[in-house]
Design a protein with these regions (language model features):
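The feature marks the mature, well-folded catalytic cores of soluble enzymes
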Residues: 1-365
């Protein structure tokens, strides 16, 4: 499949760092505890299960209204920052996540939320792909972005959907094996059908990195390779994180030639040889402030940043170590409070989807 440039269609992106001109932001309004917890159970370490119990006390299925309000305030701040930097911003239109879902194979009492468009939409060049997500509670999540997708399609973007998965019990390991510390020793998803979350893919021009995880299987990776065709090389890299869900709290490119990685989740030796010319930086120590309701469960969200270009990058305002690190590298960190967003399973990179970055398809190595 030929992938057109953003200049041809006024839509598209090939890297994580080219100048950002247009973006879609999520919205946690109406967020619910997932009606199906199989994915959450696989990616949350047992010692942190009490954190979720604190967020959803007494069997509640709704996110607390004060937490939603605080997170939406931070999204408003993020939008103001982006627009102040000259970026056009779209925002999700939340749907009614209290509605149950039912197929011939399964039923869930409610859905999740539209906080993280990066999870469900893969945008490479002018091609937008709706992901076949493994979480049953997220089956229709892209409906929250439908108005934006229609607009982009009218502007020339090609909008497709991966094969809609059945998500029958055959798509999941029946009894997930774990070691003595409770760490999964196998992935939740089987190879029964094509499954992937878009946030398991990272763009480096003609080269794409992807990580097998609890939400992305080999069949999904193979399908993306087939769709992208000969113009792209999709490299599968191995994670050290037994609870892995997405790649963007594991590695994050800063510009064309430098990236930062989580030492707990990733060994840079796992990268393909083309990265030998790049500088690799171990992520600075994470700061877990009192306001962060996830605490250590938030992992390495300090590197889940959003680049505006090769200099400007949005970073959580409480992450002083990360801010100093970026300044030392000659970058211009833009600070934004975002810790109230963490319980909705993401930070800046997760909470956004690049719609247009100025730049051509190229070899970045």
């Amino acid at each position: 499949m030929t992938i057109h440039t953003s200049e041809q269609n006024n839509v598209g992106t090939f890297t994580e760092w080219d100048p950002l001109e247009e973006v879609l932001l999520g919205d946690p309004l109406g967020a619910m505890k997932p009606g199906e917890m199989a994915v959450f159970d696989a990616v949350v370490p047992p010692e942190y299960e009490h954190v979720l119990d604190n967020i959803f006390p007494n069997g509640s299925r709704c996110y607390p209204s004060d937490l939603i309000d605080a997170a939406r305030k931070e999204v408003t701040e993020l939008r103001a920052i982006l627009e102040g930097e000259g970026v056009k911003v779209h925002v999700a239109q939340p749907i009614d996540f209290t509605q149950p879902l039912k197929t011939p194979d399964w039923h869930v009492p409610n859905q999740f939320c539209s906080s993280n468009p990066r999870d469900s939409l893969l945008l490479i060049g002018d091609l937008i792909v709706e992901s076949p997500m493994a979480d049953r509670s997220r089956y229709f999540e892209t409906f929250a972005y439908r108005d934006v997708l229609k607009e982009l399609n009218e502007r020339g973007a090609r909008w497709i959907s991966a094969p809609k998965p059945r998500l029958s019990d055959k798509s999941f390991v029946n009894d997930l094996k774990r070691d003595a510390d409770g760490r999964p020793t196998q992935w939740l998803t089987t190879e029964e059908e094509i499954l992937f979350d878009a946030a398991d893919f990272m763009k480096f021009g003609k080269d794409i990195l992807v990580s097998r995880s609890h939400t992305t299987n080999e069949a999904g990776i193979k399908w993306v390779r087939q769709i992208l065709g000969a113009d792209f090389t999709v490299h599968e890299v191995e994670t050290k994180n037994a609870f892995a869900m997405h790649i963007d709290d594991t590695i994050m490119p800063l510009d064309e030639g430098r990236l930062v990685y989580s030492p707990d989740y990733f060994d840079p030796a796992a990268l393909p040889d083309i990265f030998k010319t790049w500088e690799m930086f171990e992520a600075p120590e994470v700061i877990y402030s009192a306001k962060n309701r996830l605490g250590r469960l938030s992992g390495w969200l300090n590197i889940n940043m959003l680049s505006l270009d090769e200099k400007r990058i949005i970073v959580e305002s409480n992450q002083e170590h990360t801010i100093k690190f970026l300044k030392k590298l000659g970058m211009q960190p833009i600070l934004c409070e975002f810790e109230n967003y963490f319980p909705f399973v993401g930070s800046f990179h997760c909470a956004s989807l690049d719609i247009k970055r100025r730049g051509q398809l190229r070899n970045c190595f």
